[in-house]
Amino acid sequence: LRRQRQMCIRDRECMEERQVTADGVTYPLEEPFFVIATQNPVEMQGTFPLPEAQLDRFLLCLSLGYPEKEQELALLSRPAAVPESKPVATAAQLLAARQELAQVTVSAAVQEYLVELAHASREHRGIQLGLSTRGMLSLLEVSRAAAAMHGRTYVTPDDIKWIAADCMAHRMTARGSMWEENQETCRSIAEELLQTVPVPKESLWN
């Protein structure tokens, strides 16, 4: 347990502060740096749930599901050799894209909508632990990315709705829910909140 605790502390440090401390010496991590983790939704024996503070540092939680039929057919027909992976962007291009996203504007009305979503998650009777302030800030950042992907320089409520469940569900804890069921329950509640929290008028954010 002590070793697991030390690993969690170190993981939180690298994910939040972009540095690692070992034997009292701090090492900055090269940018861009990010962590990708996988989780098997079926086999959970022998694993332990991550603490809430560490889950909160993951920007998104995505479920890939099964491939489409056409994709599986393509897998069967490809050569047995492992396909060669080629980079699609350089580190410099990723950093430049990050700087461009910072220029995407968020109106006061949309900011207030984000705050209302966060507070609604904390006040929902089915939620024990709602969206944190860090989670709300993360939702703001991914909404900027969604706006850019949709070809706009400003965030709309639709951008938030498009990505919110993927950003919120893993950060919340449902009341009386087993570990295996928690994320599915929280995703359903997040989608419910997106339908019930009032959206600002278009004239306030456009």
Specify the residue positions occupied by each region the protein language model found.
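Canonical AAA+ ATPase core
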Residues: M15-A89, L95-V104, R144-M149
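Signal for well-folded cores of large energy- and translation-related assemblies
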Residues: R12-E16, E43-G46, S63, S77, ...
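C-terminal engagement/docking regions of AAA+ P-loop ATPases
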Residues: E123-N206
